[in-house]
Amino acid sequence: MDRIKKQHFTPLMSFSLVLTAGIITAKYSYDYLSMRHWLAISILPWSIAACCYMMTQLIRRHNPSSRIIDKLIHYQCLNLYLCIFCLGSCITTHHIDHLNAPVQIKAYQSLSSFERTILKAQDFRQQAEQQLHTLHIGEQDFAVIAAMAMGDKSALNQETKEAYSISGTSHILAVSGLHIGIIFQLIILLLGGKRRSKLTIILSTTIVWAYVIFIGFPASAVRAATMLSIYSMVLLSLRPDPTLNTLALAYIIMVLVNPFNIFDIGFQMSFLAVGSILLFYPLFFCLLSSHSNIIRAIWGLFCVSLAAQIGTLPLIVFYFGRISCYSLITSFIAIPAATLILYLCVLLFILSPLTYISFLASSIEGLMQLVMNVLTSITQFINTAFRLTSLLPGASIECIFPCSS
């Protein structure tokens, strides 16, 4: 309960709200106000804020107890918020200008090192998918594994997508915070399990970003890796666990990089889910007092799922017009299954290069086939479970809004 009380409204949260207001205003007024207009408008609040600051310092030297100081600080803060509003408008109009610019096709030789790395990673990912195909697994089993582990949802058919959507588990088909978190924890475990070790955290974060590059920089993975990087900074600073203030910092960084992130459904759902977990999870978790680690783990999983649903449910209803009635139950299958699938995929990734060692090749191939059989069994199980769930009476409430249909 004490943890709940510490979630105060901070300047970073105010910054993020005002920045968001500036971005939205600039997007819908772009036809009338360009970047030059917003730069010109921003001069006034900057000037007033600077004048208020200098007057405050001057009065403090001569009369520190003057009441005028409070008013000047108030005006200074007000104009700083206007400056932040203009900053959001400026970066938004600049981003729109960039999007409207003619597309230039570059030759491979003129690409930057980073762009070449992305292309090489794409080739490497295609080779990994082809290697999975050679292991002779079902089409939709492969599709689910490729979606979860490599961010490639192109092989998923409509029936599978619909089954996962109705059962409330479609989030595990996109590489997002859940997947990045699982991989991050696995890497820390493989490196010795020291969560506060600087070397472990730096290496784990670097490997996570290498993984994001490997799967082709999908927006959800980049978003999750950015939030994870900020979480890593919190761990390295030896401060308490992340709060809403940390989330606000992640939000500001990602919005400054790309202001149009705020209009992305996945972006909105990610931040609402994490914010809701930070707010409600401690409140729910403390309702059950048990000394059993197993019961606490199950209860913790339920509390995380419930807290995330509270935050994302309004968006799901608004955008999709659907409520998945069994999502809290299916999460007990989806999250452990996703964890096992990712762990086994990492094991396959580690074993794969060893097949080129002649005296180990036959043993490694047999072990890989065993891992693949387990992986396929898990995938078949969750595919069947979620299809059956989607067929249950009252599995979802549809067409809540007429416009959603």
Could you describe each region identified by the protein language model?
Residues 2-8, 17, 105-227, 232-233:
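Aromatic-rich juxtamembrane segments at the membrane interface
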Residues 13, 37-105, 288-289, 295, ...:
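Glycine- and aromatic-enriched alpha-helical transmembrane segments of multi-pass membrane proteins
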